Amino acid sequence: SVVGSAAAWITQALPFSPEQGTVVFWLVNLGFVVVLWAVVAVLTVRMAGRRWTDGLMVAVAPGIVLAGTINWDLWAVALLACGMYAWSRGRSLTAGVLFGLGAAMKLYPLLILGPLLILAVRSRRWRPFLLAAGGTVAAWAAVNVPLMVVNVQAWSVFFTFSGERGPGLSSVWHAWDVTAAQAGWAFVPEGSLTLLAYGTFAVCCLGIFVLGVRVRHTPRLAQLTFLVVAAFVLTNKVYSPQFVVWLIPLLALALPRWRDFWVWQTVEALHFFAVWMYLAKGVAETPPQHSMDDSVYVAAILAHMLAVLWLCGRVVWEMLHPAEDLVKRDHGGHPDTDPLAGAYAGPARGRSGQPAAVQA
C-alpha cells in the first residue's frame, strides 16, 4: 500500500540496523495509528455536539486498543470521520473527496453513499448527494487510476482475491464450515459464496433503504451508516478482527448508550482472543487438551454477531421511536433533528414540495 511504502521509506531513512528494521517499521506505523486514533476521537467529539462525551467512546474503546494496529484500517476510519464532519458543515463536495480518499484506503467508506441517497430521496434535494458522489468517484479514481495504469495486474490483486476467496475467519460462512466439519454437514459451496455473501448484503441494504425512506421521521445519517456498515461486516466473506474499528465511531454517533457499548466491546474482546487461539491451534504443536475447542471459537463468532445485531435492533427501534433517541432529544427534541444532516438538515419534503416531516 501507499502508506506501507511510506512507512518503509521512513524506516529506511532512520539510523537503525536491518535487524531492527521490522520493529522500527511497526513503531512508525504505530505512531500513525495513535495520531489517527486521536483525530477520529476529536472529530467524533465534535460531531456529537451537545453530547460531546459520547465521542469519548472512541478514546476508550478496547476494540481499537486490541485491533487498531493489525492493518491500516484507521486511515480509512479517519478519512470517513473527516468526510462526515465536512458533510455536517454543509461541505458536500469536500465530504465526497474525503470519502473517496477513504475508499482508496479501504472500500467500506463508499457505503456512506447509500445513507446519503436515502436522505436525498426523502428530501428530494439531489445536488448535495450528487456533489458528494462525484467527489467520491473523482478522489478514488485520482488515487487508483495511476496505479492501475502502471501495473493493472498488481492493482487488481485485491479485487481478484476478494472475488475468489473462500469463507474467511469469523464470518458466518466460516462458522458454518467449522461446525460442518465436526457434524459431517455440507460445506458452504465456494462457487456460490460470492453470490451468497453479496446477495445477502444487497438484501440487507434494500431493507435499510426501504426503512430509511418509509420511516415516519427522518433518520439520522449516523444511524443509517451504522446499519449499512454493520450489515456489511455481518454478511461479508470474512470478519477480520480490525473490522470492529469501523463500527466504533459510528456507534458513538448512532447509539450513544454506554451500557450497550461496554457489553458489545466486552463481547468483541472475547471474540478477538478466540480468533488468535483458533489460529494458534493450527500452527502450534500443542496437545488437544491445551488447545481451544472449535465450538468455543464458533460460540465467540455467534456472540459477536448477536451483539452487533442487538445494536442494529436498538438503532432501528430509535429510528421508529425518535422520542427515545438521545441525540435528537438533546439537540432540540424535534423528531427530524440530526446534527450531521448537513445540506439535508430540516424536515423531508412531500410530493408537493412542502415540508412533510410526518410523511409515512
Predicted feature locations:
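Generic multipass alpha-helical transmembrane bundles of integral membrane proteins
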Residues: 165, 169-195, 204-205, 221, ...
